[in-house]
Amino acid sequence: MKLYLTAILALMISLQTSAKEPESKPKAPPAQNEPLRQELLAMFKLDQKVRIEALQALHKQGVAVGQTTSLGDPKVLLVVFKQTFSMTVIDDAHRRRLDAIIDEHGWPGKTLVGADGANAAWLIAQHADIDRAFQKKCLDKIEAMPRGEVEPQHIAYLTDRILVGQHKPQRFGTQMDGQFKPQPIEDEANVDKRRAEMGLEPLAVYQKKAKDAYEQLARGDKPAK
């Protein structure tokens, strides 16, 4: 059986290069809950570490980004099993912790945990594929936050993740297949308009950045900014 193996692993990484960044930002005030911010940042670091290790492990087996190969190769199969298991264990632990944080504090927005802490919280929800109901709970919480407390692109990414998980067309084209082609998109002719409204770059630009970044990560390079 042939599969795009990197779709199993690489697409679990959520790129930080997809949003339009303003040329300059005012200095953000300190987080109200610095210990919680640091906890979320540590979770973010571990989330990305295990995924980058998975990409690099496949790269060492000669599996390139977007390449189709056979699961009959025992070495590749072992890498897929080990890395997917590691990610699942970490993602579930992070999901349970984020759920407890939400119950205690509500959604951790920028005021509570800073912009980077809020980004980390979103990423944990984005990767909680084992529990779609939890992802929907997170999306509802994020959408209910006051303006400026969350990034609009986080809503776009999580909306698409949930829709694709339900085998429905996505709205913003954030979720790719193993060859970095978007999963089916609702009203695809207007996708760039919807992306712009959420602070996302055009789909074609995102596709190229995604593929380039994953290839660099697989080689052990740092993605270009």
Positions of predicted regions on the chain:
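Bacterial N-terminal signal peptides
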Residues: 6-14
